[in-house]
């Protein structure tokens, strides 16, 4: 083990209160916390902050407004777009103004049923800005599954798009939203729909509103200020898959979650301001919440939002092409994705031709990573492949090698050890 890793481990064991209070200094707090953790009050009691301020506003205020915040890479539409932190602030602020005009405020719930498009990220951060609680539902979930989540979260507003794109298949969302709302006992006040060029959805007034028309209608409204929330106030509700029964809503806090994410970016993934991080997941899952949206932006990094598949969009070289094109420093994906790439390109011809650019490590999670898959990826890429473990209920890695602390220990088939 490295000296840096040993020192960090010892500090966390000898003085956990001090260790996590020190980690919390990576954030801007409206009111500083009184302690790191107490059994009665949880993480950072007394502390108040706003996650949108910490992911967006503070970087602009620090003079990094021109730095790239979000890269949208969509091979299914042939679109690549980059949003600076200043542009992200404007987009998030406009969505926050839209939601505020519909009466959304601190503590209200907003269901987001959207695919991998920038507007999904804008919506999540806009909710956080207002102190509202977002509940992102994986785009394309069947109406009865969406209805269950609507009934549990009881949202004031539902945000959606006219369609999602899965590989070469365009999936209209509005019919599924309409059916879900018909099945649900809870009635939302409004549905706000972003029209994509692939499908134009019909809207039913007065419930349904066009995203861009509402944006134009509220264009003169001031961007709402970031609302401070208590450390243990909810940031979001994310439902487990429901494979073992009724989906269970995991309620994520603000202060502890943000502190853990910022610490993990710096110490597990080795990512800081100006670096490019790519988690090849979906915002409908916990990896997307934590490591597409919140964690990279908390540390001022650039995050990649990828609307595509490991293979077929257009070929098994799409991962390596995206890594090389955007200068990705650390890449996070699931073992299943690598197995799909290997099946289509067993000799890694695309990887050999394209390379891995500036990438320094590949991280795997989401399921068991079999030693054979890890070995193939390490041998073909020449990069350390870090298998680490966590789950929806945790929100960040519980078992991992801390790459930035010089801890590259790994045994194939054993996550984080």
Language model features with spans:
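ANL superfamily adenylate-forming
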Residues: 77, 157-231, 344-347
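Conserved AMP-binding/adenylate-forming core of the ANL superfamily
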Residues: 52-53, 70-125, 142-147, 207-213, ...
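N-lobe entry segment of adenylate-forming
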Residues: 1-83, 87-90, 94-97, 181, ...
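Conserved AMP-binding/adenylation subdomain of ANL enzymes
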Residues: 258-279, 286-329, 343-349
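Conserved helix-loop-beta element of the AMP-binding
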Residues: 154-158, 175-191, 275-277, 304, ...
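Gly/Ser/Thr-rich phosphate-binding loop
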Residues: 301, 329-332, 342-410
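Conserved pre-ATP/AMP-binding loop-to-beta segment of ANL
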Residues: 66-68, 191-194, 204-239, 246, ...
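ATP-dependent adenylate-forming carboxylate-activation enzymes
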Residues: 114-115, 135-151, 163-172, 282, ...
């Amino acid at each position: 083990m490295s000296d840096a890793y040993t020192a960090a481990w010892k500090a966390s064991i000898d003085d956990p209160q001090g260790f996590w209070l020190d980690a919390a200094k990576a954030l801007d707090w409206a009111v500083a916390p009184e302690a790191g953790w107490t059994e009665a009050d949880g993480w950072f009691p007394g502390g108040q902050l706003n996650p949108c301020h910490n992911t967006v506003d503070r970087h602009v205020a620090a003079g990094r407004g021109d730095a790239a915040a979000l890269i949208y890479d969509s091979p299914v539409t042939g679109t690549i777009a980059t949003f600076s932190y200043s542009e992200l602030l404007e987009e998030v602020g406009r969505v926050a103004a839209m939601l505020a005009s519909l009466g959304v405020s601190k503590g209200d719930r907003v269901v987001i049923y959207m695919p991998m498009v920038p507007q999904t990220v804008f919506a999540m951060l806009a909710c956080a800005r207002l102190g509202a609680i977002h509940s992102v539902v994986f785009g394309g979930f069947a109406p009865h599954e969406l209805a269950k989540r609507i009934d549990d979260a009881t949202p004031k507003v539902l945000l959606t798009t006219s369609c999602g794109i899965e590989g070469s298949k365009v999936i209209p969302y509005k019919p599924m939203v309409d059916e879900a709302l018909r099945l649900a006992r809870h009635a939302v006040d409004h549905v706000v729909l972003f029209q994509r060029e692939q499908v134009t959805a019909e809207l039913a007034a007065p419930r349904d509103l066009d995203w861009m028309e509402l944006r134009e209608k509220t264009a003169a409204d001031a961007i709402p200020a970031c609302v401070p929330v208590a450390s243990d106030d909810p940031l979001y509700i994310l439902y487990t898959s429901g494979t073992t029964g009724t989906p269970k809503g995991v309620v994520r806090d603000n202060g502890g979650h943000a502190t853990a994410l910022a610490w993990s970016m710096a110490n597990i993934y080795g990512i800081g301001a100006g670096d490019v991080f790519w988690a090849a997941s979906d915002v409908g899952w916990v990896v997307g919440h934590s490591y597409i949206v919140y964690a990279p932006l908390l540390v001022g990094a650039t995050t990649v939002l990828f609307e595509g598949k490991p293979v077929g969009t257009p070929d098994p070289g799409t991962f390596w092409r995206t890594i090389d094109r955007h200068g990705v420093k650390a890449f996070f994906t699931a073992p299943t994705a690598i197995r799909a790439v290997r099946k289509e390109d067993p000799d890694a011809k695309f990887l050999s031709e394209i390379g891995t650019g500036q990438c320094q490590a590949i991280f795997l999670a989401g399921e068991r990573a079999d030693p054979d898959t890890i070995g193939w990826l390490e041998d073909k890429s020449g990069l350390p492949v870090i298998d680490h473990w966590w789950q929806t209920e945790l929100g960040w890695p519980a078992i991992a090698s801390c790459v930035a602390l010089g801890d590259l220990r790994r045994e194939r088939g054993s996550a984080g050890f």
